UniProtKB/Swiss-Prot annotation:
Function, as annotated: Involved in neurite outgrowth by regulating cell-cell adhesion via the N-cadherin signaling pathway. May act by regulating expression of protein-coding genes, such as N-cadherins and integrin beta-1 (ITGB1).
Name by which UniProt lists this protein: Neurite extension and migration factor
Entry's localization field: Nucleus; Cytoplasm
Biased composition (Polar residues): 644-663, 764-773
Gene this protein is translated from: Nexmif
Pfam families cross-referenced by the UniProt entry: DUF4683 (PF15735)
A Gene Ontology cellular-component term: cytoplasm
Amino acid sequence: MDNQQDKVIAASANGENNLINGVKENDSEEQDVAMKSFAALEASTPIQPIPVVQKESPMFPRGLLPLPSKKPCMQSPPSPLGLIEAPDHSATGASVNAISLTSGVAKGLNTWSLPNECEKAPFAIMEPAGISALNGDCLMQPSRTCLGCFMESKEAVDPEPGISLKVGDLNRDYETCAVSDIGIQCINAGENLKYGEQLLSDQLLGFPLHKSRAGDRRESEKPDIDLEDPTQKSYYEALLLDKCNTEEALLANSNQDWGYFETFISESKIELLDLCSKNELSVNLFSEEDVENYMFDDDESTLGSDVCSLKIRYESFQDNVRDKTTLLMQEDAQFNFFPSVFTTCPKRESKSGVLKQSSDLSQFKVPDVSIIWGDEDKNLDKKKGKEEVHEDKSIEKKDEKDNGEKPALNNKPCSGLEVEQFKNLKPDHLTNSLETSGNFSDDSSFIEVSYDAMGEIKDCSRYMARDTNSGSSSSQQNYGLRAKRKVRYSEDYLYDVDSLEGEKVNERKEWPPGGSKEEDDDEWCPKKRRKVTRKEPPVIIKYIIINRFKGEKNMLVKLGKVDASETTVNLSESQLSKYAKLSPLKGFWQKKKKQKNGNTDSVKTPFCQKQSFEPGSFEVSFLPPARKRKSKLGNRHRIQRIQSMEASASSKQVSFGSDQKQASNRKEEGGLKGTPKSALLAAPSSANGSHLRGLIGPDSAKVKAQDTEFKGPERKVLNKIKFKSEARLKSKKIKTGQENKPVVQMSPVSEDPSSKANLKNEVTPGTSNSSHMSEFHETKVVKNSTFLPTTCSSEMPLSSANVATNIPVIPGGYLQTLLDASDLSNNTSISYFTNHSAEQNEASLSQTEKAFAPLQSAQDCVLSSSSDSQLQQSSQNFKMEASNYGSLWPDKDTSGSQEFMTEVSGEIATSQSSEFEATQVVSMENNLTAITYSPVCLNSGGSGCNKVLYASVQDSHLAPDDSYQLCHFNNGEICFPFQQGPISTEDDGQLFSFDSMTPLSVSSSSYCPLSLKSCEKDGDDDINDDFLAHCSPKLVIQQSIDEIAPLKESTDLLDISNFTPDKFRHSSLSEMSPPDTPSLSPQSTRCESIKTLGTMKGFQEGVPGSLSSMEKIKWDCSTLSQQVQADDGFTLNNHQFQFHMFNDEDSVGLLQKNPCLSTFDEPAGQISANNKVSKSRKKTSPGKSGAVSQSSSQKNTRKKSPKASNKGVEKPPSKTSRQVPKSAKKGKYVAAVNGEKMQIGIGHSGGQPNSTSSNGKTLTECIQHGGPVAPMKIPSQKGLSGDWALGKESRPGWNDMSVVTNTNNLLDDDQREFQEPSYILSNIASGMADVQRFMMASMEPLWEPMEHQGESNTFYSPDSNSLKLKTLKILAGTPQESKKKINNGSSGATKNHRSIKAVSKSSGKAAVGDPGHADVSGSSEDSRSAFFDKKYSNMNTLGNNGPTHKKLYRHKSSSKTLRDEKYKGKRVEREQIHKDEAGTTCFEKLRGSSYNLLKAETAFGVLPVFEEETHIFQKDI
């Protein structure tokens, strides 16, 4: 109440001022009342006192104001009642003036907290002393939000009509306005309202005041137009005071008021800025240091940031202002601006004794302000004296200032001069106060008052602080409050505050306030520093700018001193050279860069040359940048194929040994696979490519290499050209191929030697002696005996490269690759196959040639249906010939392969790994069979030939294995044939080759059609589906995307694979456009299979270590192949799972199962279910008890997984049973158990059991394939991580099983993916990791293709053929033992991979459910594992055996969760039903999960059966 009393004193002083100004005592009393009311209003709204001041100021000279100031000095201690009563009389303008000053002081008072009190208290008390006028602030309190309430009551009491009108107008305005509005609007509505309100309202508020206020403003303006400058000054003072009052009033409810005021400030911010910009005063204020002060003031409260002070303070002010009243807050804001100006000016004025701010204010209200300020100073001093007392409670400064301010106020008001000085100061001070709200310097008492008033309400102090920043209205009271606040506000006020405070303190002689100001100064000084610091950013910016131009990385400039004495320079050559040395031109660095690049290229070129690729082509494939280029991925794949093929051809031409060395070196250097791939690649290159490249190989290889070279640096342009160049090469190769084809055919028709000679002489290096290839293989095996799988893998890449060369895989799209493959199929492809055939025999070559004749048309048709039928016929012919060819070829090739295998075996030190050694070095027995794939690859060379070889291999596994091995190596050159061959000794191998090659076939277009045709021999429907799907945009695109995605960078793999599988899944394959597929599929497929095979081979070579990577790559290849196959085989499945298509292809690939495959395609559901059930039963029956028990074990524990692995594999999981059936059973069981246990979450701990399982599965597959898988399984159990060994074996040995398993895995995994969100996440993670691995593999596809061919063919075949072969073997007519073995091995592999996936996922359940967990645990897991091992083998390491992309995508659909649930149920059912029921349940649930949409029946026809079997195996395991 002391503050209120001070306000009352100020009000009474104002009342006397009114009298002095010639206004009646009553008027003065009324004015006092008005002052009170205004003080109250000011407490709520800074503007109100100003209107009164405007009127009063004109009425009485400044000189009178000091007297009233003295009078308030006398009335300094009025009681709150007096204050309350006084407002009735202070309704007069003089009172208002006093109040405006008072309200500044009263602002510190609890005017708002005393609203009722104000109304209750008679104004009469205030009337005589004018102290009541200060309590007029309290009168505002009746309606804290509306001064109008107070003004109304005051107006009712107001005897002075003139003032009463003004006050009444204010009251009306107040009624209209909220407290905030009252503060600004109502006060503006006061006598000062017209000018100040209009000015502030229009400028600050950006909107007119209330009509009542406008009317009052007009009324006051009419009599006081001349006084507008003083009035404005007083108005601004009032604004300041009002802000103080408003703050005070608001401070009564400081939280509300301040928040409201702050909100108002933010709201009025823009308006205030507009007004300030519009207002002359505001312009001056803003233009001057005041702007900074204001900025700093407002910023002080808000951010305390000098740079942002203006804006921030303005924002803060407006936030508060609009909360309170837009007008009030805007006025406050303007006063914040003004206070900055005023504060700055008063500080200056303090020094000069003139109100510089008054000058600024005087623009509108300098005289009035001076008078009012003097008066107000008195009133404020008195008020502050009281407010000080009141405020002392809140703040030390307040106390300090109160003590000093009271005497200062009392003294100042008492002495007219001092009052006048203070008056001058006061406007300044108010201005300063507003700005110095934190400053107590100018008017310590006033600051005290505001501080005290604010002190009463600590929120007020906070509010005042904000107000100081936000608005100047809180200047006086806020000053008191901001005395401390000012320290904080000093940030904003910084400079102004210090200077103002110093000046104000000196001028006002507010010693205690000076002390408080010193405190402020102390704080302010640091804030000044802060402000100075804020000005540093330009320096920072400068440095930033400078840093920008510090120079480029390579902008090395040799600074040389130029002879300044040389006024003229002769630009002679010597001088130019000198200057050139001083500052070499861009050309110099360009040359350097070119040289550097040339060196790099030369370094890279040897790698390419090592594989006999064109440096550019090979370079592009191997260059990490090329890999990193997603857009170049397809090209890289194509390049890889081309380079591999060229390398194969070149190697073959040059010398198998040297090329082999180069290839292996290059592969070792360039690829993950390293030497193994190189060896494999070189071997096929030498064997297949020597003459082939001599004839077609060199031409196509060179052309392709050139294209690829172009493509490397100009890949985009070349990509555009690639179709043309591919077509051109295709035409060439078609012609050459046709020419060579007859030669090749004639050569094969001729005896092998002549045929070989012809082939060697001609462009059909494929027809080159199988002995030659065997020699090379042997040489390479001898050289890389340990790396024989690598040799196979290298050959695989070379096979792909040769296929690319033969099918000059121009950087063009997949179609051109297909076309080139078609041409090369007839020409180079035959040569490749012929190389395989060469190893196999000339008859096989002839068969291959025959196959290629249809194949060429088929591939020329880009896998057209007629081509497909041709391929079928060709495959049939080849198959028919295959028997002969198999007999011939197995004899020769087997011998050659066996020699090779023997050497390899010696090298690898595995019993029968020679043939399969390409696939797995560790287990030579079964691997020997796998290695015999190479002859199969000859048949693979002609898809029919591969089929025949497969038939032969099926018939005689060992011999076919030899052929298979040759096929491996030949596939090294022709990724597909080898894959076909090695994938399944039976048709599975071919189907695998088809599937694996399907991408590769797509790459080397003839192979895919050939493979498809080969597969389609037995099942035209499947082949048509596969072929059509393969040829169809869906299949092609899917293959290309799936294949390319893995080959692309990890991002590409993830992006393309993730998006493509889902895209293919969700969009029918037909929706995919073949053009996309051509560009992606050939390269990705081939590269992927090459990479995968190469990786597999590398892993197989170093089975334990490499196998993991190999398996990953293998799985990737399988995934790609399977996806391609899924496209080919099942559009729906491909849609769901690209591997479904591969399943069909696998079915097609399985020659033995081809009838079933055809049946599968047509009555796929029935036959698949039946076959799957029977197969799963068969698989289960071989180790049914083990499978069932292992199923329990799987679920129960991983312990049983090892047991089951031992069971399935022979008891030692690490020791692969040599007995193929037992191994197969064990592999199956182990795979199931391992997969199951891995699914259980045992992860890789059962890796060796999984390894055993994988080995067993692989062995089973190998046995089925003629024993190549068994050695693989053995090596897996021996040293290969079970999963990886199985992955390798599963891929090569898996062909049937892997296809089936992949099919089931696709479905099951997809469903499981839907079923298990965690599995999805795990799949995503593992998929990404696998993608990266696959990317790594895809980074080295050049040598990988060889490996791919050597062993990866098996892997890739397991990718494609695993699903289909397994499906076909399970469903189709594959021998039960083979089926069982394949399924078992596949299941083991699948489970291993799934187990790995489960481990990675740390979700055994997910792993178990990965395949969709059909009760066909064996088949489902085989399918799934094969699939996962293939596609997710890379991801499998991460723990995702399922289709990474699908998982990544399919997890998007809720169906995966459903599938997870279903899968869980299925698992239970599976365990319960184990076989048919499980398979049926899985099938049903898979359908239920809408996994297979359109082709679900077809795909599930195969897949559910496999799932059933897989599930059975899982359970059995």
